[in-house]
């Protein structure tokens, strides 16, 4: 395995499959992670996953990614999307490109969910496509970090 991609899941995503399945779907976080790991393995990419309900732990994991040589971060910051300058600063501080993912369409929900502290710095934002959004983000990430085929 060559390059590394880190997938970060924010607060309450450990409750996937139980919490508001009509909004977030029926897959568990473990289901999603296993699908992503298998998808990355097919491309000979190392994929690490991390979930925390604690903002500081997520910031620490972002900092750690820089020392590990992570090439790209896929992050679902969950509720921290709308509140965390610390996450924004951590992502900018490590200068690792990132894709922001949301299971639900945050723009079709409550007004307070419409603003993201990360979107303007992300290389892309995917929302409203459920767990497939992670898969689409990973497809793009793999394409972005793998060397071009010279043929």
UniProtKB/Swiss-Prot annotation:
Homododecamer. Signal peptide: none annotated. It comes from the Bacteria. InterPro entries: DHquinase_II, DHquinase_II_CS, DHquinase_II_sf. Catalyzes a trans-dehydration via an enolate intermediate. PANTHER family: CATABOLIC 3-DEHYDROQUINASE. The record marks 19 as: Transition state stabilizer. Its EC number is 4.2.1.10. Substrate binds at residues 76, 82, 89, 103-104, 113. SUPFAM superfamilies: Type II 3-dehydroquinate dehydratase (SSF52304). Pathway: Metabolic intermediate biosynthesis; chorismate biosynthesis; chorismate from D-erythrose 4-phosphate and phosphoenolpyruvate: step 3/7. Belongs to the type-II 3-dehydroquinase family. The active site is at residues 24, 102. This is 3-dehydroquinate dehydratase. It is an enzyme of class 4 (lyase). One of its GO terms (molecular function) is 3-dehydroquinate dehydratase activity. Transmembrane segments: none annotated. GO terms for biological process: amino acid biosynthetic process; aromatic amino acid family biosynthetic process; chorismate biosynthetic process; quinate catabolic process. The gene is aroQ. Keywords: Amino-acid biosynthesis, Aromatic amino acid biosynthesis, Lyase.
